[in-house]
Amino acid sequence: MDYNKAALEMHESHHGKVGIVSKVEVKTRDDLSTAYTPGVAEPCRKIKENPEDVYNYTFKGNMVAVVSNGTAVLGLGDIGPEAGLPVMEGKAVLFKEFGGVDAFPICIDAHDAASVIAACKAIAPTFGGINLEDIKSPECFEIEETLEKELDIPVFHDDQHGTAIVVTAALINALRVVGKKMEDVHIVLNGPGAAGTAIIKMLMTAGAKDIIAVDQFGTLYKGCNSAEAHKNWLGEVTNPRQIKGGLKEALAGADVFIGVSKPGILTTELCKTMNQDAIVFAMANPTPEIMPDEAKAGGVRVMATGRSDFPNQVNNVLCFPGLFKGALSVRARDINNEMKLAAAYAIADLITDADRSEENIIPGAFDPRVAEAVANAVAKAARETGVARL
């Protein structure tokens, strides 16, 4: 199927993928007077008296803003807000179709962090949560961290944490397959950008103790003096053995390779230098860091990619619909590490001991159990950690 042609036809024939649908009918004068003036004044008064009533009288409780400035859209790069709109519409569709969550795409003409932060704060009263999307690094770090501190609704950068949660879920099961423990394995991550950094943080939360991050210049270590602040931080908290060099040096004896970088960077020969029962997650799209057959030829036992045409697809759609569904259901003020880890285990635990195998470590994107399982786990963790209003 020619997906490019099909996508153009879909978008043009429907003039986009989302629209506003009224929940009520306005067929009579009474309907009009109830839905709008004069009747609408009463819920306005109630909300004025008690701002929390906005969740009872409006769509806020199930509405997420999908916010982007179009500076890091898929593999297209900085294409601007207008060109990024089809992606944000698509994200809104996935929220609704997979999680029953209403979402509205908002593409803003704002390039610096301060402008994006100001825009999000200005629109926050309308929404129960904000999903940040396709905002370039390093600005995305400052934007998310600031909004998390200054807003009382959940803010979630899916490119970072959605990826991290699903990777963690997949690795939990991959380690179960090979009989290793998170706290014992040596993990190498290639590509410590936004997603890579979040993956490292999530794996550390899950118990990983020996992680090495590798960028285009080599391993990150204490005093590596990177031009990027987050990489200096990674150098301080990872690489406990202070291994210096490149990917070759980092991979020697490694149990796990996680790639969020570029095609072809991992070779069969490099895989042969890894530990027995090696695990490789090659998630560069559309062409991974190594193809599955090449990895298997190098002795890799469990392989995952970001592609749907290979087993073990690492796909963010397993996370964000259910995650926001759970957070919104308890009116969470935040999405904290405990909620993220709960989501990862909820995804992983859907694969039973009987079904788990080298080629089945994570549910498929259309598994109907996923969103509900994630939502329940996230809501429970929110209550247990004190960020839930309900």
Region spans (language model):
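Solvent-exposed alpha-helices and their adjacent loops that cap or buttress functional pockets
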Residues: 55-60, 96-97, 122-124, 148-149, ...
